[in-house]
From Swiss-Prot:
The lineage of its organism: Bacteria, Bacillati, Bacillota, Bacilli, Lactobacillales. It catalyses: oxaloacetate + phosphate = phosphoenolpyruvate + hydrogencarbonate. This is Phosphoenolpyruvate carboxylase. It comes from the Bacteria. Belongs to the PEPCase type 1 family. Pfam families: PEPcase. It comes from Streptococcus sanguinis (strain SK36). HAMAP family: PEPcase_type1 (MF_00595). PANTHER family: PHOSPHOENOLPYRUVATE CARBOXYLASE. Keywords: Carbon dioxide fixation, Lyase, Magnesium. Its cofactor is Mg(2+). Its EC number is 4.1.1.31. Forms oxaloacetate, a four-carbon dicarboxylic acid source for the tricarboxylic acid cycle. PROSITE patterns: PEPCASE_1 (PS00781), PEPCASE_2 (PS00393). The gene is ppc.
Length: 948
């Protein structure tokens, strides 16, 4: 049975109506800010863009003064943003509406659980499933936080539109509020004046927990359990969704991530979740006014109530209230310990409760860096409670399990005394939240490049007089040295008095901090350590040496899992050899056994794409998962995958449900993790309804892929794979010949794109490259993809696809085309692969791309565009032929309509950006005027709804 995507139920008429309201308001606001002549130019440019009259549009843009471009750029940047808001509001409405009328849609949780409810292993699947979105700070969120805040205000107002039409909200007042926020947006800086710091990235992402994640995940957990129990499936402690975090722990190529940022990230996360608990417990305190005159309580609740510092005579007969007050006091005390950094050198929480620490600052509820994201009323409540805590000893919680046990005492008492209806709602939701978030909120991954680990280990071995030139050893010799240290030598190598390099000192501090945080907050706070550019077993063992230095690993077990990240095509091809050798090591088997026999492997989508092109990347990743899963089976290890996907197709992006359900069979062993980064976080999780829906998609897709056999005919399956091997090998050659084989390509890319402006754009704390860029290989994947998106070529998402498939078809035109069409209908991986290319092509614009090519001074370099254009046309023709359609996005009318609304406006921005780049290169722009290029980058990314 097939279902429609929820987006297909969107109300296009409502969206058009709301877009008309928003655009009229924006036009009226802009008219008041500009001269009649300049506003007339905006109207004309808008008309020309809608009617695709690019030549005339270009002529007008070339005549604009730089001052005129300021507000014109803002106007055409805000227009697509307002359209995005309208679409997001409609989607949020449909999520609620379709669920309320019990309408099935693709990925709906109830339908998915129905699918497996009759299976013998249904309970095992639902109990063990763990899907982990990992939030990263990869710099692709071009919007300032201030603009995002204004966006949220407009979103909230637009959600009232249906009530306005029904007469439930005053229309004049509503329009006035909308106008105010749009006018504020129009006159607010759209770009950051300074580069983000890691601390900014941490606090920014925490806002999503307060606005969406906490409520959405809690609601999802309650629904997950309810649906299972309704179908007779009893679950003990399921965790279908938990959260991951890279910000503060990912130091690969980012020198600004330190031990301090790791500590800040972990402690701020704990503050956020503890404040959430404090707020929820206070709500329960206000609600549970049950009197002993009218109801009974258990002895355990009575004993807890007696410990409360709430001695009001009005609550003498309200034991539940006093019990919740006691719990709240313990939570606040826990928060105070955490806030003041009460960790000793070995990581254990201090027990000193000196009077001055309790009375120091009434607003100690949150850190200075994070105070703004905690509601004021919670800070006030904590301040009031401090006085009580000073008067009488109140313990803190050492673990989240202790907190849950206290809540369970109240829950059990209510159930025992016929309070089934009372426990549903807030109390049940709070218990679910504790299961998922503990006191840590999200597990932080640590990540570093393998070359850094090698340099640190080489220094440690030399300082301890073990090996003086470790890096010169062969791979076999390295492994022998490392294994001897791990198995036979108990020494702490860093304990020598030899002076340490700045790099080694910094790395050791980070690992020490990780140990302290795990001891203080719990094991869940840091579970994985990822090794970028993993190429060998020694890369994994070098990290083990570093972990051993701080007591996070020994010969019997590991407190942190070592996770290799295979990124390039070559490394992915060699990953099976690396992992087979690693899994054969007895010590590695013990480490894995201490992690319930799961071994995670991270797969890099971005670098593999830049290395070999879209087809080669996707197919290499697909085969690697098949082969690595088989190697895990050989050693009795459950291999799980962490997908390092970006927002764009060129970095592994695309529709999430299809991406997961098209993974190889058996590639999801209970667990799957995937990165959510940059603009994707805001688009998917900007409000609790959208967050719930996207989490539902993740879990439903994972379950579907675990239980549904997509390719039952092994002969056909083998033929699929033989065809893919042939096509992909050719695609790889075509891609490499141009990107790395044509000496003109480097100049073409840097001259025909806004890469220099993107590299200076203040959208993240991390540099655009790991080192000075002298070749394409030295450029990070994000600015690489971002630049092609801006120039509207979308090169990483399709180049090499058309020629490789055309050559295969031409070998036997009638039969080969027919079989590719058969594969498209029958093989989810292949359909997802081509659908993503279809989507990327629909966002490209080769008329605009041609104009960017003209930025190249040398005609010989400009000629590269003709190669790209020929491949683009061939790719489009071949894709439509295989799909059996006459136009792009024939199967995704929602996106087609959405692009139809937005595309004319950000097309204008491309022409403005082109003119600005020309003026910049001719020395006609001041430094302040050059910032206009950043505004156009912002607007184009907003219109495309992705960047890097």
């Amino acid at each position: 049975m097939s279902f429609n995507k929820l987006e297909s139920y969107s109300n296009k008429e409502v969206i058009r109506e709301e877009v008309a309201i928003l655009t009229d308001l924006l036009a009226d606001i802009t008219r008041n800010l500009l001269s009649p002549e300049t506003f007339e130019k905006i109207s004309l440019m808008e008309d020309l863009a809608v009617n695709s009259k690019y030549h005339e549009l270009k002529a007008i843009v070339e005549e604009l003064t730089t001052d005129e471009m300021v507000y014109i750029s803002r106007y055409f940047s805000i227009l697509p943003l307002l359209i995005n808001i309208s679409e997001d509001v409609d989607l949020a409405y449909e999520i609620n509406h379709q669920n309320n009328i019990n309408q099935d849609y693709l990925g709906k949780l109830s339908t998915t659980i129905d699918l497996i409810s009759t299976r013998e292993n249904a309970q095992e699947i639902l109990e063990n499933l763990n899907v982990v979105p990992v939030l990263t700070a990869h710099p692709t969120q071009v919007q300032r936080k201030t603009i995002l805040d204004l966006t949220n205000h407009i979103h909230s107002l637009l959600r009232q539109h249906r009530d306005v039409k029904a007469g439930l909200v005053n229309e004049k007042k509503w329009l006035g509020n909308l106008r105010r926020y749009i006018e504020l947006m129009m006159q607010t800086d759209m770009i950051r004046e300074k580069k983000l710091k890691v601390t900014n990235e941490i606090t920014n992402v925490m806002e999503y927990y307060n606005s969406s994640f906490l409520q959405a995940i809690t609601n999802f957990m309650v629904e997950y359990r309810r649906l299972a129990e309704e179908r007779g499936i009893k679950l003990d402690n399921p965790k279908p969704i938990t959260m991951g975090m890279w910000i503060g722990g990912d130091r690969d190529g980012n020198p600004f991530v330190t031990a301090e940022t790791l500590k800040l990230s972990a402690t701020l996360q704990s503050e956020v979740i503890l404040n959430y608990y404090i707020d929820k417990v206070y709500t329960l305190y206000r609600t549970f006014s049950l009197s002993t005159n009218l109801s009974e309580t258990s002895q355990a609740v009575a004993e807890m109530a007696a410990l409360s510092t709430d001695k009001s005579v009005y609550r003498e007969n309200e034991p539940y209230r006093r019990a919740f007050h006691y719990i709240q006091s313990k939570l606040i005390q826990t928060l105070l310990y955490l806030k003041e950094g009460n960790f000793s050198n070995d990581g254990q929480r201090l027990t000193d409760r000196a009077e001055e620490k309790l009375s120091a600052k009434a607003n100690l509820s949150v850190s200075n860096k994070g105070r703004e994201i905690i509601p004021n009323y919670i800070q006030s409540r904590i301040s009031e409670t401090l006085t009580e805590l000073k008067k009488e000893e109140t313990p803190s919680y050492k673990t989240a399990q202790e907190f849950k046990e206290d809540l369970q005492v109240i829950y059990d008492s209510l159930i025992e005394h016929h309070g089934e209806a009372l426990v549903s709602g807030d109390l049940t939701e709070l218990l679910q939240a504790v299961d998922v978030f503990g006191f840590f909120l999200a597990s932080i991954d640590m990540r570093q490049d393998s070359s850094v680990h090698e340099a640190c280990v080489a220094e440690l071995l030399a300082s301890a007089n073990i090996v003086q030139d470790y890096s010169s050893l062969s791979e076999e010799e390295k492994c022998q040295v490392l294994l001897k240290q791990l198995l036979e030598d108990p020494r702490i190598l860093s304990a020598t008095h030899e002076p340490k390099s700045e790099l080694l000192q910094k790395e050791l501090e980070i690992f020490k901090t990780a140990r302290q945080l795990k001891d203080a907050i719990g094991e869940e706070v840091i579970k994985q350590n990822i090794i970028s550019h993993s190429t060998s077993v020694s890369d994994l063992l070098e990290l083990a040496i570093m972990l051993k230095e701080v007591g996070l690993i020994d010969e019997n077990g590991a407190r942190v899992q070592i996770v290799p990240l295979f990124e390039t095509i070559e490394d992915l091809d060699n990953s099976c050899n690396t992992m087979e050798k690693y899994l054969s090591l007895p010590i590695a088997q013990k480490w894995i056994a201490s992690k319930d026999n799961y071994q995670e492997i991270m797969l890099g989508y971005s670098d593999s794409n830049k290395d070999g092109g879209y087809l080669s990347s996707c197919w290499t990743l697909y085969k690697a998962q098949q082969q690595l899963t088989a190697i895990g089976d050989k050693f009795g290890v459950k291999i799980t995958f962490f997908h390092g996907r970006g927002g764009t197709v060129g970095r592994g992006g695309g529709p999430t449900y299809e991406a997961i359900t098209s993974q190889p069979l058996r590639s999801i062993n209970d667990r799957i993790r995937l990165t959510e980064q940059g603009e994707v976080i805001g688009n998917k999780y900007g409000n609790k309804d959208a967050a719930y829906y996207n989490l539902e998609m993740l879990v439903s897709a994972a379950i579907n892929r675990m239980v549904t056999h997509k390719k039952s005919d092994s002969h056909t399956s083998d033929k699929y794979e033989r065809i893919m091997d042939q096509v992909v090998n050719r695609s790889y050659q075509i891609y490499r010949d141009l990107v790395f084989g044509d000496e003109r390509f480097y100049d073409y890319f840097f001259e025909s794109s806004p890469i220099k402006a993107i590299s200076s754009f203040n959208i993240g704390s991390r540099p655009a490259a790991r080192k000075t860029i002298t070749e394409i290989g030295g450029l990070r994947a994000i600015p690489w993809v971002f630049s092609w998106s801006q120039s509207r070529v979308m090169f990483p998402g399709w180049y090499g696809v058309g020629s490789s498939f055309k050559e295969f078809i031409d070998e036997d035109p009638e039969n080969n085309l027919a079989f590719l069409q058969f594969m498209y209908k029958r093989w989810p991986f292949f359909k997802s692969l081509l659908s993503n290319v279809d989507m990327v092509l629909s966002k490209s614009n080769m008329n605009i791309a041609f104009e960017y090519a003209q930025l190249c001074e040398d005609q010989n370099v400009r000629d590269i565009f003709n190669i790209i254009l020929d491949e683009w046309q061939l790719t489009k023709d071949v894709i439509l032929e295989i799909e059996g359609h006459d136009e792009l996005l024939a199967e995704n009318t929602y996106l087609r309509d959405s692009l139809h609304y937005r595309m004319p406006y950000f097309n204008v921005l491309n022409y403005i950006q082109l003119e600005l780049i020309k003026r910049q290169r001719n020395g006609q722009l001041t430094p302040d005027q050059e910032k206009l290029i950043h505004i156009t980058i912002n607007g184009i990314a907003t219109g495309l709804r992705n960047s890097g």
